[in-house]
């Protein structure tokens, strides 16, 4: 709009910084790929000061603090933090206000294996290092915000912790700031061969931290508390709530931590309830989805089974959804669902009814989901197996998972060189130094193997995550190799198709594509009549 353009023009004039270059795409890149938000801003609680990442000719070594005065333009203060880190190229992955004049900033080097936590003074621009983590491979959970005590003397964050031969798992660390020296001491509050997913709240009155974890199962999420003093006693607050149908939860606490909202997401029909923190057994059901539950009970839906496969010294989960009339005497096509990025998880206890459910019930297709090496929430050892060999080891696992099935189709999203650079470099390294790694992960070398296959490519023209050049390069090689393909374009849609009409069209396209090719290639064999005894 003209008004927004007017505001932007004023902002540009008031931020007087000779030589500073602003790039819209880089702003998105930092915001969504690193901070996991769409706008790279961090607001103080009273909404009067904003910390904002900027790009300079010397890489992202400047932070802009914008003071809002209720007018159309924003006078700004520029804080240069050179000298804080030992490397020239780094990312800011997290900014959190500690007080009106101090911010906590996490810096990540370009290879993403060195993370430095600093406290920066907004009035002087000076930053002091408080905590550093180094790794031989990339570091995950770098956009997570620490949870602070009210006086700022201690804060809690999720860090990788070694757990014997099983490797590292994410756990909660309490960092205490020494009053006189401002040095930080660290105490680990949790440990074990399971993952802390998210820190939800800190109650100073009871001195307890509340968090979600995979302690019971990597496929589930349970709400736990742990004491920050004494023997660090741990308690599960959700384990006894509707345990027959609820093992996967999310939760949110009230401002004073007296109550919490518990969202059961599966495996049964989702349920939302409010609980008293001091007595979780005292609760009120807000939504039980009774109509949905009754509808499902009336229908004969598909059966789901989870198998553990032993591959390369790992026990990896394979989830199979069978048609309602499945029998061992028939032959079925298998659709393997592949997620888009390392650290993702497909085999969970979440309630799931999606487009692929239609294929299972209507087209008698077995749908498989598999979490192989490179998947998340099973420890860092499994996750980091794809380091410098993405597109190789996880593909071997996927082939092993379906090798007993005669007919297989795949549905995946996106894997690298034309991908967002921070994402690609995290797993494959810097292109100029790791050209062989990028080449090894490319599908273009095996393009002739697709000659006899059916291929559907879907891309939104406004996709800023995987640029359209990615698909264009693939199509160019498909044409050269004489491979037939179908291309579906969605104008003005991003990486995730957003509008309802576009989503309906996308699902119809995918269902039609798989239904046609799977029926053609893997017809169900007629059942043989059983002999009377």
Feature-to-residue mapping (PLM):
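Active-site-proximal cap/loop segments of hydrolase catalytic domains
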Residues: 369-533
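Beta-propeller folds
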Residues: 1-253, 258-259, 265-270, 347-348, ...
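Cap/lid segment of the alpha/beta-hydrolase catalytic domain
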Residues: 135-136, 289-408
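Conserved beta-strand positions that form and line the central face of beta-propeller blades
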Residues: 48, 61, 129-130, 185-189, ...
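Active/binding-pocket-proximal capping segment
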Residues: 110-111, 120-127, 132-136, 168-196, ...
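Generic beta-strand/beta-sheet core signal
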Residues: 40, 106-108, 120, 132-133, ...
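Short, solvent-exposed loop/turn and secondary-structure capping segments
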Residues: 2-14, 115-118, 273-274, 330-331, ...
